[in-house]
Curated annotation (Swiss-Prot):
Name of the coding gene: thiQ
EC number(s) stated in the UniProt entry for this protein: 7.6.2.15
Reaction(s) this enzyme catalyzes, per UniProt: thiamine(out) + ATP + H2O = thiamine(in) + ADP + phosphate + H(+)
Organism encoding this protein: Brucella suis biovar 1 (strain 1330)
Protein name: Thiamine import ATP-binding protein ThiQ
GO molecular function: ABC-type thiamine transporter activity; ATP binding; ATP hydrolysis activity
Subunit structure, as described in the record: The complex is composed of two ATP-binding proteins (ThiQ), two transmembrane proteins (ThiP) and a solute-binding protein (ThiB).
Coiled coil (residue ranges): none
Amino acid sequence: MTASADIRLSDVRFSYGETAMHFDVTITGGEIAAIVGPSGSGKSTFLNLIAGFETPQSGIISINGVDVTHLPPADRPVSMVFQENNLFAHLTVEQNVDLGRSPNLRLNEEDRKAVASALARVGLQGKEKRKPEALSGGERQRVAIARVLVRERPVLLLDEAFASLGPALRHQMLDLVNKLRRETGMTVLMVTHTPEDALHLDALLIFLDNGKIAAQGPATEMLSRAGPEALRHYIGEMRSF
């Protein structure tokens, strides 16, 4: 069982090009949060700061009360799934998941049981020996999620992980992640260009604009007619295309 972990960004500042970003927010352990906002608003940077791929110029990032601001990514209790390039093409499904337990693919019996269990939980029984090229886009992302499970980290970051999937398959993947979150207690943060995903998950919605948190709250409230004007304007612009 994965323990829950609060995530705290305290007065975190970071500059990217001409964009000065400032984040001050707490995500409660076990919660699922959707990060939305215009292109260039800082969504991926927000996740990269938590994962350790970027280092803030000031402020503190803590996970479960531990300051991780200057820890390298490998030492943080975080797993991350991207839209592409999550798998090694020359390895089988099983071997790609094995990497979550052992970088040199040397697994003991307990590890192998964990891998088999993870593959079963994401619906990939019988496909262990296939290579990624033989899988659909949704199946490849299921492999990535299985690897997250065997790593047993309390925080999962999804950077537009399901953006290339059609609506029905994307909802299947979101439902899978939400089911696993409830089972394990992990904290999930996901970047999405589809605010309706937050409604589908009944998630906390964090709206970024120009490198700052412009608004946050339950998706059902934020996406209602009474929601923040900046968010309603953003959604209106999206639907005009």
